[in-house]
């Protein structure tokens, strides 16, 4: 599990356009999360940064923490890399960092399109709202697809995963999963 207090603090700093300070980490979510860790016999931590933060900054006994990085087996994509096309981005739209990522992509896409006029980016994500679909623009090659019925197929056929995630915590599953398919990100 990623540390929610860290993600919340990063989100707040991002939205206020300020640099994250150590004092920003101390909030009600922090207190509940640290209390939960201290009540448990063992907490699994998937991020080396977060493991070090807990031990070094917050003096959590490393004997009640276990670093367990996410990993996965390499998968054989359906399509050879030379046959793949399009940029993709993927993420559930109920998760604020994923919505902010799409907004970042919309800003960046015009510059990418100038360099690669034939390029398209396909945006996948469950729970896409009307405001998400309003960003769809076929002329610009900015295509909102909505929910991916088969993520493996999407990753197997794409050329590059783009994920300018402005804030968050933990390890990004989409980055790890894309690597399993040999998809640069």
Task: Describe each model-derived feature in a short phrase.
Residues 19-26, 141, 162-165:
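Short, flexible loop segments at the rims of nucleotide/cofactor-binding pockets, characterized by
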Residues 20-43:
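Membrane-proximal helix-turn-helix segments that form the acceptor-binding/catalytic region
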Residues 152, 173-181:
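Short alpha-helical segment that forms part of, or immediately flanks, the ligand-binding pocket
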Residues 25-26, 102, 144, 168:
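A conditional alpha-helix N-cap/helix-loop micro-motif detector
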Residues 2-27, 82, 92:
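Acceptor-binding helix/loop patch of EC 2.4 sugar-transfer enzymes
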Residues 15, 38-44, 49-157:
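Conserved catalytic-core segment of nucleotide-activated headgroup transferases in glycan assembly
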Residues 41, 156-170, 181-185:
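Acidic donor-binding loop of glycosyltransferase active sites
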């Amino acid at each position: 599990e990623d540390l929610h207090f860290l993600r919340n603090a990063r989100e707040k700093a991002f939205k206020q356009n300020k640099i994250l300070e150590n004092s920003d980490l101390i909030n009600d979510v922090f207190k509940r999360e640290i209390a939960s860790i201290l009540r448990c016999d063992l907490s699994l931590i998937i991020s080396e940064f977060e493991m070090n933060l807990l031990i070094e900054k917050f003096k959590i006994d490393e004997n009640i923490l276990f670093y367990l990085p996410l990993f996965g087996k390499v998968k054989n994509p359906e399509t050879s890399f030379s046959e793949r096309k399009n940029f993709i981005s993927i993420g559930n739209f109920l998760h604020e960092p994923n919505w902010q990522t799409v907004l970042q992509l919309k800003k960046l896409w015009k510059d990418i399109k100038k360099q690669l006029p034939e390029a398209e980016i396909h945006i996948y994500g469950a729970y896409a709202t009307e405001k998400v679909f309003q960003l769809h623009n076929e002329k610009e090659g900015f295509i909102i697809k909505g929910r991916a019925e088969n993520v493996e197929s999407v990753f197997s056929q794409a050329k590059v995963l783009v994920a300018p995630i402005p804030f968050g915590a933990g390890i990004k599953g989409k980055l790890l999963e894309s690597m399993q398919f040999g998809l640069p990100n």
